[in-house]
Structure formats: C-alpha cells, structure tokens
C-alpha cells in the first residue's frame, strides 16, 4: 500500500491518528504533550473531518483532572473520546482512569512519557509517569519512533474498541514526541477500513440514554465487589490476541512485522536486552555494529 510521506514528529503522528478515531477531545496542555492537543484543536477549528464524517469537539478544561473527568463523562454518553498528557498531568488523571477501566469504556490516552517531578522539575523523558498507572486497568502500548507512532496508534484505538479496554498509548517525551522524521502517513480511508464498526455501534448502544435508562456508579459491598473485579480478568486475558489481530491488520496493509514483542539480533545470542521506547533504535544500531565486527 502506497502512503504519502511527510516530515513530522511523534506528537503530530499521534494527533493525526487520534483525530481520525475521536469524536470528543478533553484537553489541557502540558509539556511535552501540548502539540498533540494543539493540532487537534487547530484541525477541529478548520473543520477537518474524522473517519465518521464529523468534526472533533474539543473541550479545554481547567486542569488535567478536569480533562480526565470530561473524557469519563463523554465516554459514558457514547462519544469516542481521547486526551493527551504527560507527567504530573497524567497523575491527576489516575482517579478517573480507574473508573474508565472499571466500566470497560474504550478510549486512548496519548502520552509523551515524561519524568514525574520530585525534588526538582524535570520536563524530559522517562517512563515514571506511565509506570504510575500500571494498576489502573489501562492497557499500555509503546512506540519507538515517529513512524511507529503513526503505524501503531491505530492498534490502540481499534483494540480498545474491540477489547473493551482503555489504552495508554505512549512514546518518549521529546526524544520521540519532538523528533522530526520523514515518515509514511495513514490515509483516513485505511484507518476507517481497520475500525471495528460493530464494536463502535455496541459501545454507543450501551451509552447512558433516557430512552433505555441504566445505573452507573453503584455501591457494592465486599462480597459482590470482589466477584465483579475478578470477572473482568477474562477481558484482560483476551486482550493480547486482540492487539495482535490489529497489528496483523497493519502488517497486511504495510508489509511490516509488528508484534507484541519483536526480536532483533543474532539467533544464537547469549544475552538479551528487553527494552521499549526510543532506546530500541540505539540498541539496534549497536547490534548491527557489533555484528559487523564479528
């Protein structure tokens, strides 16, 4: 499949895909994720259409906590919703992340991973913000470079819908978010072709609606609460296969070999580095260099 090439950074690539699958964006800017929300806001103001033929409604709140609340509420009424954040901003979203995951609401948080400030402010990239969210119930997908952000972000959106699980889609702050590369760009028709429309309709059918009312945010005692928490394990057990399914759809369209894990290096290697994020490009170059030297 031939795709057009454009020079862009990781933030732009993520925003390009997010806009396609989004009906509402709840935003609040924080470095280094701000350009994603900025692009979505600009495209919405210009009347750009998503794959559903509508313009994204952008709601800027007073804080990241407010943005997360907007995402939660918007999902509850059946609108496909996205947000963009990092660092302390992501930490402010954690209370709503528990609720979003617990209610099996499909959405994507695009995160340009950044250091969580402690004894001092640090705006540069690491995974401390992402790791703080591991037990929220969000699935996590990580990309290495801007091309991977473009290629794999649709996997997060589509797998979230089919797997009924919210995704934290992340890449390294500045190192990937602001790295400009000449990459191949998705056409929205191809993104629409991958979208599980039956899952979209099912999501909308379960939205809060006065014509078929349902209760949300109920109170449960320990006996029932535990059973319900255990019941969701089947959703998470099935999720890796769903992610792999959409990675294979991407591979079929692009001729790539994306998988849940990709091995790179000699088949008889005695030591293995397990890594994710922008470091992978460096590791591959080192492997090539050492292999060439024998």
Predicted regions and their residues:
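Thiamine diphosphate
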Residues: 1-132, 137, 154, 173-174
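Glycine-/acidic-rich phosphate or pyrophosphate-binding loops and their flanking alpha/beta elements
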Residues: 9-13, 248-271, 284, 288
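Short helix/loop capping segments that flank catalytic or ligand/cofactor-binding pockets
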Residues: 93, 119, 178-180, 282-284
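Glycine-rich beta-alpha junction loops
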Residues: 114-115, 171-178, 277-279
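Short helix-loop-beta junction
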Residues: 42-46, 285-294
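C-terminal substrate/ligand-recognition segments
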Residues: 275-283, 290
């Amino acid at each position: 499949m031939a795709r057009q090439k454009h020079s862009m950074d990781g933030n732009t690539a993520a925003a390009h895909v997010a806009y396609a699958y989004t009906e509402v964006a709840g935003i609040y800017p924080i470095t280094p994720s701000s350009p994603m929300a900025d692009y979505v806001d600009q495209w919405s103001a210009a009347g750009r259409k998503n794959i559903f033929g509508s313009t994204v409604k952008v709601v800027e709140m007073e804080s990241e906590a407010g943005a997360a609340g907007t995402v939660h509420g918007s999902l509850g009424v059946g609108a496909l919703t996205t947000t963009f954040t990092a660092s302390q901003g992501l930490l402010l979203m954690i209370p709503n992340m528990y609720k979003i995951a617990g209610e099996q609401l499909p959405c994507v948080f695009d995160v340009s991973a950044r250091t969580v400030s402690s004894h001092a402010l640090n705006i540069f990239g690491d995974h401390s913000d992402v790791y703080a969210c591991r037990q929220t119930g969000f699935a996590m997908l990580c990309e290495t470079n801007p091309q991977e952000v473009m290629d794999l972000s649709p996997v997060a959106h589509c797998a979230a819908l089919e797997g009924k699980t919210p995704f934290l889609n992340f890449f390294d702050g500045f190192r990937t978010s602001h790295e400009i590369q000449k990459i191949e760009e998705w056409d929205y028709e191809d993104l629409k072709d991958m979208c599980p429309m039956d899952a979209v309709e099912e999501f909308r059918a379960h939205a809060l609606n006065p014509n078929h009312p349902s209760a949300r945010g109920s109170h449960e005692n320990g006996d029932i609460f535990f059973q319900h928490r255990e019941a969701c394990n089947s959703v998470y057990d099935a999720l890796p296969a769903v992610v792999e399914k959409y990675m294979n759809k991407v591979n079929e369209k692009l001729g790539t070999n994306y998988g849940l894990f990709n091995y790179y290096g000699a088949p008889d290697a005695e030591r293995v580095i397990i890594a994710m994020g922008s470091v992978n490009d460096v590791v591959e170059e080192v492997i090539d260099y050492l292999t060439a030297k024998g």
